Amino acid sequence: MLSNMHFLCGGRIVWGEITQTMYRAAGGEEHEPDGLASEMRGMTGVEVSILIHEIPEGGLRAGFRSKGLFDVSRIAVELGGGGHVNASGCYVKGDYEAIKKNLLEISVRHMGE
């Protein structure tokens, strides 16, 4: 998973995804490795981490973490989720790739505000 991370906004956002293919390769268990989102957030220069999980019924669930400099609940709320400044999340059904693209665009837009 850590080799599959991507950076946006000059490294201020780091995001990774766990797809259904990855779940199957790991034996079919759908769980987030303990502390992965927090570990991602702890990287130098990163203000926000996003961990995206593809869900079997189509769509995704995502967790957002912040060091407190950015209110990640704003991203989650726009996607129908919730949370607080440092930790929030959302669950969205539909086309995985389209939702992921929208989520990342929203994240970049909010980071620029």
Explain the meaning of each model-derived region.
Residues M1-L79, G83-E113:
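Hydrophobic helix-and-loop "lid/oligomerization" segment in the mid-to-C-terminal part
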